[in-house]
Amino acid sequence: MATKLDTSSLLLALLSKCSLLTQTNLALSLLVASLASLALSLFFWSHPGGPAWGKYFLHRRRQTTVIPGPRGLPFVGSMSLMSNTLAHRCIAATAEKFRAERLMAFSLGETRVIVTCNPDVAKEILNSPVFADRPVKESAYSLMFNRAIGFAPYGVYWRTLRKIASNHLFSPKQIKRSETQRSVIANQIVKCLTKQSNTKGLCFARDLIKTASLNNMMCSVFGKEYELEEEHEEVSELRELVEEGYDLLGTLNWTDHLPWLSEFDPQRIRSRCSNLVPKVNRFVNRIISDHREQTRDSPSDFVDVLLSLDGPDKLSDPDIIAVLWEMIFRGTDTVAVLIEWILARMVLHPDIQSTVHNELDQIVGRSRAVEESDVVSLVYLTAVVKEVLRLHPPGPLLSWARLAITDTIIDGRRVPAGTTAMVNMWAIAHDPHVWENPLEFKPERFVAKEGEVEFSVLGSDLRLAPFGSGRRVCPGKNLGLTTVTFWTATLLHEFEWLTPSDEKTVDLSEKLRLSCEMANPLAAKLRPRRSFSV
């Protein structure tokens, strides 16, 4: 009996010791694993460019030239660079600090990124077939943009969309056809500004021009015409959808770069996308249904064009919704943002505004309104638009980045497949090695002297290519530039734009969302220039 008891006690004691040993080993194993993981993370982080680049170089098979750049922080890299509302300025300053203006590497969590602030390297990236794809963010995928021109993978489907848009929305013939529409909306803007000025004394043009730009795209894409002076439920609804979409696409989503965060959705981007998409589907489906119920001999707007496609070009309804949604989305913001920057510069530089007025009086006179056909003769005004594009590019980082499809060589350095590439157009446009006195507002630099070729901002010269270049150049660049120049000519022909006080200052603070807009809306006094107000 006693022996049995002693044996049982011994067994219990041994089991207890084994249990203790197992727990100790487990704790030690976890500690060793944690320390090893931390050491590895610190090793990755210590590499130029930060953790994502350190991980790549650990597994590389051949020695390659290191691309300089900031390490950032362990695990997250340089997320703070892109989280800033002045990301383009932060990146430019960092590139200068590391003497990496030609090519700089940094990490966004687990994402490898390269960025250039040099026009030659920018041309190499943007015109390379290796960078024909775009990295698709979670928000872009959720909002269906992976099935539209902006984010669709480079290939047959993307080329089909590009061809359809180029032929039926952005061709010179189509731009000419929509001239009357832009003229009508320009007249409506003038009426609204006159009314606002008479009522309040001050004018805040931002919201008005955004709504006008939205109306313009709704007319081209959906065939819907609205009076700018009246409130329309459909316009207000679409404006809310577009604003929410801008906010979602313009926010740096940490889960895109730190996959272990994806389950938590810390910024609620996935949740907000899930709420937005059904609303977009209902809105666009309603438009499509209306068009299907109508019978027309020939397409009258872009919805009709998409519905009439047949054969290999035929699109499914979800793809049609994605394409239409993107056209409205992309075609609204840039025009309004750029016009507000131009008007701000005119208020800040009354001498330059006076030169524009003199040109308008010479070419157009004060007895009639500006017509779109006048714009080709408005050389100085065109130079003003280009100079504002240089100082205040709406997409300072060219809005959407590129993605390396395969390993490649850029500026003599190996760039692996899967690397995100960015071009800091703002930095190039402010580089004293590229532009003389780059901080000075001087439209004359874009006025071609006799025998010189006019400077093009449409992508052929990477010293200033605000619409991008290469395969992924903005397809609506000609339409956007035409609209901006004509509406600006109208606003400056009809009014003199003045500071609201005697301080003669304008707040040029920036805020980078999806586009780089004025941080505070422009406030101005208007003085009519024509007795024949539209």
UniProtKB/Swiss-Prot annotation:
EC number(s) recorded for this UniProt protein: 1.14.-.-
Tissue expression pattern: Expressed in the funiculus of developing ovules.
Coiled-coil parts of chain: none
Cystine pairs: none
GO molecular function: heme binding; iron ion binding; monooxygenase activity; oxidoreductase activity, acting on paired donors, with incorporation or reduction of molecular oxygen
Transmembrane portions of the chain: 26-46
Protein keywords: Developmental protein, Growth regulation, Heme, Iron, Membrane, Metal-binding, Monooxygenase, Oxidoreductase, Transmembrane, Transmembrane helix
Misc. comment: The gain of function mutant 28-5 (T-DNA tagging) in apetala2-1 (ap2-1) mutant background show enlarged and wide pistils and siliques.
Annotated function: Plays a role in seed and fruit development. Functions probably in association with CYP78A6 in the regulation of seed growth.
Protein name listed in UniProt: Cytochrome P450 78A9
